[in-house]
Each structure stands twice: as C-alpha cells, then as structure tokens.
Curated annotation (Swiss-Prot):
It catalyses: trans-4-hydroxy-L-proline = cis-4-hydroxy-D-proline. Keywords: Isomerase. Its EC number is 5.1.1.8. Gene3D superfamilies: Diaminopimelate Epimerase, Chain A, domain 1 (3.10.310.10). This is 4-hydroxyproline 2-epimerase. PANTHER family: TRANS-3-HYDROXY-L-PROLINE DEHYDRATASE. SUPFAM superfamilies: Diaminopimelate epimerase-like. Belongs to the proline racemase family. The active site is at C88, C236. GO terms for molecular function: 4-hydroxyproline epimerase activity. It comes from Burkholderia thailandensis (strain ATCC 700388 / DSM 13276 / CCUG 48851 / CIP 106301 / E264).
Amino acid sequence: MKHLHIIDSHTGGEPTRVVVSGFPPLGDGPMAERLAALARDHDRYRTACILEPRGSDVLVGALLCEPVSAGAAAGVIFFNNAGYLGMCGHGTIGLVRTLHHMGRIAPGVHRIETPVGDVEATLHDDLSVSVRNVLAYRHAKDVVVEVPGHGSVTGDVAWGGNWFFLVSDHGQRIAGENVAALAAYASAVRAGLERAGVTGRDGAPIDHIELFADDPEHDSRSFVLCPGHAYDRSPCGTGTSAKLACLAADGKLAPGAAWRQASVIGSVFSASYERAESGVVPTIRGSAHLSAEATLLIEDDDPFGWGIVS
C-alpha cells in the first residue's frame, strides 16, 4: 500500500492539493527537469492524486519539492487532470498558505521555484498572498478564428505563465449559473484555434481560453476554461497576468495601477504590473483557505488505485 500525504486548500473557490510526501524521488535538478521526470516515469502518481475516485476535474495538484537554491522557500510542480502546468497563480497562493500552516514560513517575502522560473511570493500578516509572477507578454493581437456555430471570434494570444487566448467580444453572459454554456463556447473556441493552427511562441499549444466582461463592482469579470475542460473558480492568476500584459500593450493600464479581476463565481484578485524589457512583471494578490489534511491510500489490489483513466 502506498501513502500520499496531502493538504487541500482553495483560493477564491479553486482547490489546490499540495502533495507533501509519497511521490517517488525526481532528482535534485531544476523544477523543469523534475517535471519531465515525473511526466515520463511516474505519471500514474498524478492520476492517482487528481483523478476520481480521490480527486476531480477541477482539482490542481502541487507537488512540494526541495528547492535547488538554498535561498528559496520551496520548489513546486503543478498538475491537473489533463497533465502539467508550468505555473499556477491560485496554486502558488494555496501553496504559500499551506507552507505557513506547516510552520515552514512566516509572513514575509519568499521565493518559490517553478518549472518556468522563480516567483516571489509575499505572505502578508492577514495571511493573504501576493505573487510576483514570471514575465508576461502579448504574443499576438486581434487573432481571428472561425468557430462553428459562432462565426468569427477575435482575441489576443498572451503568456502569463500558461498560454491564453483572451476574448472580450464574445456575446456570452459570464455568470455562475451559465458555466455550462460558457464551457461549451470556450471549448469550441479552443478547437477553432487548433484547427487554424494558432499557437503560442515556438508552436506551444494554447490550452487556456479566457472570456472577459464588464463587472459593476470590479474592473472585469472573467471565465477561464482550463486544460481538461474544467473551469477556474478563481480569477486565475496566470490568466490575470496575461490580461495585464494585454492591457499594458494597449496603453489601457499604467504600471502600478490596481486592477481588480473578478471570477465567474465572484471571487476577486487584485493585480498590478511593472514594466519589463519584453513584457510586464505582474503581481497578483489573493487569499487561500485550508480545507483538509489527509493521507491518500493506494491499495495494491485496487483496480482504480491509480485513478479512473479514460
């Protein structure tokens, strides 16, 4: 029998499952190398942790790793039901809150190593977390794709730690009771991008679709379709970062100015950015709450011990 020690939290409604122990050794190299080793040699640990019967499509996993640098608080590898994520904003907030719960960090500034670079996370006295993300930038503006049943859809391609297609003119109602229709629409847009061969830099697949609308109380409200067809309950940290990159490129938001991004369920991130040579460096602030601490058990004779894999 195998044992996986996990701590669950949610950030604005979006769950994060931090794996404290139980995964196999992945070496002591950079997080990108360890991610590759996990995906290549031990992917069944991801499926056991994230897929049913122990997990769900909405869950994001965060494998806690020893960092390469002695000056970093932790290393992390993010994953979900579809595979692996280079970076995860809500997951980083959940990880930092979990590290505090474990007694490993106190309020202050901490460095977290991820597969796409180091991020700076500040744990505030009220236990909210600010994440200074990796570089974000717009890759392409006003990209037009044909979406069957919806006609032409125009959006921007941007990087915020993951690849996004951001759409404002979509005609959809962004509300919690409309998520099924939103997911179907966003999925059709993603399929349209694939058919048209629209990608991120170096042919990277665009696996996140982000829809925006006006919000009466905040700067914007969004719906984000993640890889694997689950939607983000939080405002999406990497998606908000990609949005800031587009706003900055269009001259619609000044450096240091606050942007309040609401999610489809109403949770909120506060964000701002600093200019950089080839894009912007975003900072996202939000809060996570602990929800469970447990040991997942994998019995040797369990036919679904490694998850229900379709």
